[in-house]
């Protein structure tokens, strides 16, 4: 059998009252009223409290989002109109219908990846039917007519 544990004695009421009376006489600040803070500003700014980092039990999204605009979706198809053919012959420029969300840098990267050609610049416009047209100007070391034959435009 274990030895009896030592139990701390509770101070009796009279001793505790004497202790409190002594503290009051000496002027201990625990028993005095707290002085009110004087506010000089009209607006009240709520104090900043501790914000813990989020630690979720499970992820709310099951799969990471995939890129919906890849190179094959950016370039829809090349234009084969007479004006587009004239651009190919005269200005060393290919004309494509592209995705409406694609910007010039994405169009340039898609043309480079799909056809292995360097582009000098890309001009875009949105047609009245709501599609985006891109004029892809090639560098002088590439011939737009040869590229058009390779693609199958001509």
Swiss-Prot record:
**Pfam families, sorted:** Ribosomal_L23, Ribosomal_L23eN
**Record-linked InterPro entries:** Nucleotide-bd_a/b_plait_sf (IPR012677), Ribosomal_uL23 (IPR019985), Ribosomal_uL23-like (IPR013025), Ribosomal_uL23/eL15/eS24_sf (IPR012678), Ribosomal_uL23_CS (IPR001014), Ribosomal_uL23_N (IPR005633)
Sorted alphabetically, the Gene Ontology cellular component annotations on this record are: ribonucleoprotein complex; ribosome
Keywords on this record? Ribonucleoprotein, Ribosomal protein, RNA-binding, rRNA-binding
PROSITE patterns per record: RIBOSOMAL_L23
Does the keyword section mention Repeat?
Answer: no
Q: What would you give as a GO molecular function for this chain, any one?
A: structural constituent of ribosome
| Any single GO BP term | translation
NCBIfam families per the record?
Answer: PRK14548.1, uL23_arch
**What family is reported?**
Belongs to the universal ribosomal protein uL23 family.
| Function, in words | This protein binds to a specific region on the 26S rRNA.
Would you tell me the protein name for this molecule?
Large ribosomal subunit protein uL23
Q: What is the species of this protein?
A: Fritillaria agrestis
Q: What is the lineage of its organism?
A: Eukaryota, Viridiplantae, Streptophyta, Embryophyta, Tracheophyta
Name the encoding gene, please: RPL23A
């Amino acid at each position: 059998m274990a030895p009896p544990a030592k139990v701390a004695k509770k101070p009796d009421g009279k001793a505790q009252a004497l202790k409190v009376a002594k503290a009051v006489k000496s002027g201990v600040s625990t028993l005095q009223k707290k002085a009110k803070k004087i506010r000089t500003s009209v607006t009240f700014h709520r104090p900043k409290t501790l914000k813990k980092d989020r630690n979720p039990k499970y992820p709310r999204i099951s799969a990471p989002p995939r890129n919906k605009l890849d190179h094959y979706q950016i370039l829809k198809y090349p234009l084969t109109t007479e004006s587009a053919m004239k651009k190919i012959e005269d200005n060393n420029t290919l004309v494509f219908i592209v995705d409406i969300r694609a910007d010039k840098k994405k169009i340039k990267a898609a043309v480079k990846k799909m056809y292995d050609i360097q582009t000098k610049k890309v001009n875009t416009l949105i047609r009245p039917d709501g599609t985006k047209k891109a004029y892809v100007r090639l560098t002088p070391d590439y011939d737009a007519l040869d590229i058009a034959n390779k693609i199958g435009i001509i």
